[in-house]
């Protein structure tokens, strides 16, 4: 497992170690022990995942930008097991020097890359292939009453989603999220969300 730090502290790209031969390939998609050994020293704390989710979406589907409000905040470890997606984490912690900034990474069935999104970030993705199967691990259970989001179509975020706007396919809920300028974040850089 190779851990790549990004330009925003705590947001990580994870490359698994692949074993290939004439039959195909094998890799450990997740090892709690190795994740804790390699990621906890970077983050300054451990992360314990408790729920796995999977979605299937067609080209142009955009999901996000989602988060859960305190006290039900979530970290996520995501990957694309079929197809291709552009995955994005946006810093929405008040007082953060990178507030409103984002990290984008292409996750594909071929690169096997995983993306770690810490608490205090909004998360979303756009499907770039005909279909995509997307999996994610969460360190807190889903609480619908704590659902939150910011607009995935907010131009001020400067995200190039790599799909034409007229091909974007959003849920009704995701069309109603506030733009960043109108958003009152429930997160603060000075509050440790992992305590």
Which residues does each predicted region cover?
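Conserved metal-binding segment of the jelly-roll/cupin
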Residues: 107-131
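Non-catalytic, conserved peripheral segments adjacent to functional cores
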Residues: 1-110, 131, 138-195
